[in-house]
Curated annotation (Swiss-Prot):
Disulphide-bridged cysteine pairs: none
Name this polypeptide is given: Enhancer of translation termination 1
Biased composition (Basic and acidic residues): 20-32
GO biological process, one term: positive regulation of SREBP signaling pathway
Organism: Scheffersomyces stipitis (strain ATCC 58785 / CBS 6054 / NBRC 10063 / NRRL Y-11545) (Yeast)
Designated gene of the protein: ETT1
Region of interest (Disordered), ranges: 1-37
PANTHER family: ENHANCER OF TRANSLATION TERMINATION 1 (PTHR28290:SF1)
Entry keywords, A to Z: Nucleus, Transcription, Transcription regulation, Translation regulation
GO cellular component: nucleus
Family: Belongs to the ETT1 family.
Entry function: Required for correct translation termination and probably involved in regulation of hypoxic gene expression.
Cell compartments where the protein resides: Nucleus
Any Pfam family: Nro1
């Protein structure tokens, strides 16, 4: 597809205001001093050259689909948003004089503006004051947009993403292991609850209005941000401990937090991990509702990428993440079963972590079987790695049955077929995995 260049930011300089500027106006001034406002970005032809809002939307998509590592582009987007906002206000004043004002910036304008402001914080993590300013401005812009578009699902999704990023970049980044909750340091579980309530509000409205097309890759990113945030909380303090202790054991040991720590309530509760699981499964259901003709039987493979339902790549990505989450949950009961069944050092033990041999086996088998289902749905005929994910899950499931039992051999044999196929098309990339299975 042919592309063209777009120059933006030529008219972004604003007149000085007598009243105190809002956060986003102060940011506009700061960014104007950091370099030329002239930016050239290639856009797809679908952007109407005469529609500035459409151009902004296309520019944001260009950035959003990139590596997101270009601060200059983000500055340009913010300058353009500011210019469009000022022009809109000027037009509003003129039209109001004629009592004919009907112009209103669309909800996605406010969404782009807010997300761009939050994105800018990622480039200034060394200056927490700036980070706070960017996030305050981002939340303010989202709220202003919602005041004009009260039923905007997109703005609610965007706000929830901003709030999640804010927790990590503005707050967690400043914490230490011995930090305690105070007037200046909030209990972060309440902030996380607020972000998740905002997401749930968007999710509920989308379902009520049957706007299932909104459950796309952009919104899936919100759940990824949450997953990353929970991982940060789980591993909080390990990097500090590793710097102070030369022992490798630190990597596997969780750093204890006092009840007064801002992250304590998040780490000690499993409700947030369960929330993620529940809502990504619901996300998958909504994707399926949008793509009514989508194939969900892993055995029904399209003959080529061109014949695929357009939502299948998204669906595969969701299923992969769900499958991986079940595998992760299965790690503890699987380890308990293996230890009680095969470790002579525990032959007199009846339980580990409150689980007996039979209980741990049953729980792990159920979790890995569920994981296997989703990983099979995540298989891509063009990506051998997705086949190997299935094979490895089959091996893990086989390990939970009696040695040389019919069930174990069945899972191993199926895994071997898959690994041989993957190994052949990748010129031996998975030879080690295959040899490990065969015991060579």
């Amino acid at each position: 597809m042919a592309k063209r260049s777009l120059g933006i930011g030529k008219a972004s300089k604003a007149k000085k205001q007598k009243s105190a500027p809002r956060e986003e106006e102060k940011i506009e001034k700061d960014q104007a001093t950091e370099g030329s406002n002239e930016i050239t970005v290639e856009l797809n032809e679908e952007a109407d050259a005469n529609d500035e809002i459409a151009q902004l939307k296309a520019l944001w998509k260009t950035y959003n689909d990139s590596e997101k590592d270009n601060e200059l582009v983000i500055n340009g987007i913010i300058h353009e948003c500011d210019r469009l906002l000022r022009n809109s206000k000027l037009g509003e004043e003129k039209e109001k004089e004629k009592e004919q004002y009907t112009q209103e910036l669309p909800d996605f304008f406010h969404s782009i503006y807010a997300l761009a402001l939050a994105e800018l914080a990622k480039f200034h993590t060394e200056d927490n004051k700036k980070v706070a300013e960017y996030f305050d401005a981002a939340v303010e812009r989202a709220d202003l947009g919602l005041s004009q578009h009260q039923d905007s699902i997109q703005l609610l999704f965007s706000k929830s993403k901003i709030l999640l990023h804010q927790i990590a970049l503005q707050y967690i980044s400043q914490l230490k292991v011995d930090t305690s909750i105070s007037k200046k340091v909030p209990k972060l579980s309440s902030y996380l609850d607020s972000a998740l309530r905002t997401y749930e509000e968007a999710e509920k409205k989308a379902d009520e209005l049957k706007k299932y097309e909104l459950f796309n890759a952009d919104q899936l990113e919100i759940l990824q941000v949450l997953d990353d945030l929970l991982d940060i909380v789980d591993n909080f303090g390990k990097d500090i401990a590793e710097g102070e202790d030369d022992d490798d054991e630190v990597e596997d040991d969780e750093i204890e937090l006092e009840e007064s720590h801002p992250l304590y309530a998040i780490r000690e509760s499993d409700e947030y991990n369960q929330w993620w699981r529940d809502h990504i499964i619901l996300f998958l259901d909504n994707v399926d509702k949008h793509g009514k003709e989508i194939k969900v039987d892993f055995k029904e493979k399209a003959k080529s990428q061109e014949e695929e339902h357009p939502l299948l790549p998204l669906r595969r990505e969701i299923c992969k993440r769900i499958g991986q989450s079940y595998l992760q949950e299965a790690e503890v009961p699987s380890s308990v079963f293996t230890t009680l069944a095969y470790d002579d050092g525990f032959k007199n033990e009846k339980e580990i972590n409150g689980l007996s041999l039979k209980e741990s086996q049953k729980i792990a088998q159920k979790l890995i079987s569920t994981a296997l289902k989703y990983l099979q749905w995540a298989e891509d005929q063009e990506e051998p790695e997705t086949w190997v994910n299935v094979a490895e899950a089959m091996i893990s499931l086989g390990n939970l049955y009696e040695v040389e039992s019919e069930e174990q051999e069945s899972h191993y044999q199926e895994a071997e077929k898959i690994l041989n196929k993957a190994n052949n098309v990748t010129n031996g990339k998975y030879e080690d995995v295959l040899e490990n299975l065969l015991g060579d």
